[in-house]
Each structure stands twice: as C-alpha cells, then as structure tokens.
Amino acid sequence: MRRPIIAGNWKMHNTTEEARDLVTLLRPLVGTARAEVVVCPPFTAIAATVNAASGSNISVGAQDLFWEDKGAYTGEVSGPMLRDLGCRYVIIGHSERRQYFGETDATVNKKLLAAYRNELLPIVCVGETLAEREAGHTLEVVGRQVREGLKGLETGQARDLVVAYEPVWAIGTGKTATAADAQEVIAFIRKTLGEMYGETAAAIRIQYGGSVKPENIAELMAQPDIDGALVGGASLDAVSFAAIVNYDQ
C-alpha cells in the first residue's frame, strides 16, 4: 500500500517570517493527516521552515539542488547544504526549471544522483507541453523524461523515489488535466518504471501536479495510480493546503 504524499511547492514566495507563520497555521490543520505532508520553501526560508515544523508531521523539501557537492559554482546550493539545513525532500526538474533555466533530462539525472548521494528523497517532475500534447506526443515525451532522468538509479534506490507528473500546460494556468487524463499518463509512467525496476515500480509513489485545488483533489486521488499531489498556489494558504492534505477526511 503506497502512502499518499501531498507536497506544497511555494516557488518564489514567503520570507522567513511568512514561512514561519504559514507553518504555524498549518500544523494543527494537518496533524491527523493520513497522507505524508511536505512543504518546499525557497532556499532562504528553509531553516525557518524546518524550525517551525519541528516536532510535527510536516517534512521540508527544497525546490532544486546543484549536482556537485561543493565547488566554484556561484549562486548554487548543494545536497550537503540542504541536508545540513534539515531538508528531507528535493524537487528536481520542475517544468519552470526546464522552461526558464534550461534544465534538461541530463541535468535532472545528475541532480537525482546528487540527491541520493546526500540522502535526500527526490521528487522528479515530468510532463509535456501543450504543443507536445496536441501533436499526440505525450507518452513519448514523458517516457523519455522518465528513462533519461532516472538513468543509473538502482532498483533498491528507486523504492524511495517520488515522480510528479505535471503537464506543463496545466501549471499556474487554472487548467487541469481531467482525472482520467492524469490517470492514463500516470499509469503509463508506472508501466515505464516497471520496465526499468520490475516489481519495485508498484511501490513508487507518483503524484499529479497542475492547478490542484481542494475542489479537484478527491477525484484525482480516487484514481488507482495517483498517489498524491504536487501543489503550487493552493499551498500558500494554510486552509486550502490543509483541505487538499485532508482530502479523505
């Protein structure tokens, strides 16, 4: 039985004080959640978020990391630094990183291996653009992103992996893939993982991301292969995020 995982990606929002306030509001609202709860603040607010979440059932993740552990890489943040701050998870390959910062399947793969090297649990994002979907290339694109992004990952490591399917055309647009559309692609991702990792694929958690809201979470979570959500805007409001986390209550 795969435990559901709901992760909030705060993106470039929340100062340290705002992060502290949000987690303080969130703690009592999600304290009895069956799902695993993760929040991913910007780098500058990680320490404050970890402190505010201490002793609760809220884990903290980062939104990115660099693939080297140290060196002359101005502006970058490494796996050891994230571990030192108390991070448990790290998002890798988010569509905004691919769109604005030139992230590729190859850099996603290097970052994935860096995460495992530093005992961080990766949330690896995959998904097609609107043009790719309209051309009928969704499964081809997503399959390639999965295979290339996870290259070199051993079966024993894959059990702890989280994959997030986030169709690029549904990020921040208010558009959501239907639950059936999301299930179709996520079932394909699980099939691809099965070709790579055999029976272990049944244990890998796969999230949906893309305009997830309290209004659509239950229908998404009712699908057999959807194990959680990567939540953007709705995670910035404690009540909305808690409603998503507590979708089954």
Swiss-Prot record:
Catalytic activities: D-glyceraldehyde 3-phosphate = dihydroxyacetone phosphate
GO molecular function ontology, one term from the record: triose-phosphate isomerase activity
Record-linked PROSITE patterns: TIM_1 (PS00171), TIM_2 (PS51440)
Domain of life, per lineage: Bacteria
Keyword hit for Cytoplasm: yes
Biological process annotations from GO: gluconeogenesis; glyceraldehyde-3-phosphate biosynthetic process; glycerol catabolic process; glycolytic process
InterPro entries associated with the record: Aldolase_TIM, TIM_sf, TrioseP_Isoase_bac/euk, Triosephosphate_isomerase, Triosephosphate_isomerase_AS
GO cellular component: cytosol
Claim: Cytoplasm is one of the keywords in the record: yes
Binding site for substrate: N9, W10, K11, G172, S211, G232, G233
Compartments it resides in: Cytoplasm
Keywords for the protein's UniProt record, in alphabetical order: Cytoplasm, Gluconeogenesis, Glycolysis, Isomerase
Pathway the protein takes part in: Carbohydrate biosynthesis; gluconeogenesis; Carbohydrate degradation; glycolysis; D-glyceraldehyde 3-phosphate from glycerone phosphate: step 1/1
Active site: H94 (electrophile), E166 (proton acceptor)
Enzyme Commission numbers on file: 5.3.1.1
Primary location recorded for the protein, binned into one broad class: cytoplasm
Role description: Involved in the gluconeogenesis. Catalyzes stereospecifically the conversion of dihydroxyacetone phosphate (DHAP) to D-glyceraldehyde-3-phosphate (G3P).
Family that this chain belongs to: Belongs to the triosephosphate isomerase family.
Subunit details: Homodimer.
Family matches, as PANTHER family: TRIOSEPHOSPHATE ISOMERASE
Name of protein: Triosephosphate isomerase
Organism: Moorella thermoacetica (strain ATCC 39073 / JCM 9320)
